[in-house]
Amino acid sequence: MTKIPKYWTVAKKYLSKKDKVLSNLIKKYNSPSETVLTSRKDVFYSLCKSIIGQQISVAAANSVFLKFKKKCKNKINIKVVNKLNIIQLKSCGLSRQKAKGIKSLAKQTLNKTFNPKLIPRMSDEEAIIYLSQLRQIGRWSAEMILLFTYNRSNIWPVQDIGLLRAISKNYKKKYLPPKSFVDYLKNKHSPYCSVAVW
């Protein structure tokens, strides 16, 4: 894991001034043991984990991921994963579609049709579109990669159930909160939406 993003402290001060609700939440959770956004900076690892975790419980995802990690002999990298076949991947508990997604990811990364090194130079939207071209990776998954792997400062995943529930709870709105209000908060919290989401 890496250090906290450089923008973290500035973002908290900015959001505290802009939004009374967030100001109260930041004060509530502001402590030496505060959990902050960090990253392992390994996009291939993160994409594999993202594909594995789709549409299953956290417990199930963790179980499958541990089996996958063991199958990779604790070395989740492109060359190791590329040597695994679909049957080996399925034996970890992966569906055929997810196994194909991970195989495709390894192949595309090896032949450079997918090049993660290009992403830091892209805008958020360009990066989302680029990542979404990968098999088994949709917009929400791409946003999670930008948030948790690249630590982009202004990600606002409007399809995220956790975010929508948090908005409903903290801003006293019905669930689902109106799109107009979600968009209003995005504009209000920009350019530090990622910190607001966290």
Question: Where on the chain are the PLM-derived regions?
Answer:
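N-terminal polyanion-binding entry modules of DNA glycosylases/AP lyases
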Residues: 1-122, 184-198
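Amphipathic alpha-helical segments within well-ordered protein domains
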Residues: 48-49, 53, 86-90, 128, ...
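Alpha-helix capping at helix-to-loop junctions
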Residues: 74, 107-115, 133-136, 147, ...
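A short, terminal or domain-edge coil/loop segment
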Residues: 94-96, 129-139, 171-177, 194-196
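Catalytic DNA-binding helix-loop module of base-excision-repair DNA glycosylases/AP lyases
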Residues: 123-168
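C-terminal end-helix/capping segment
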Residues: 160-175, 180-187
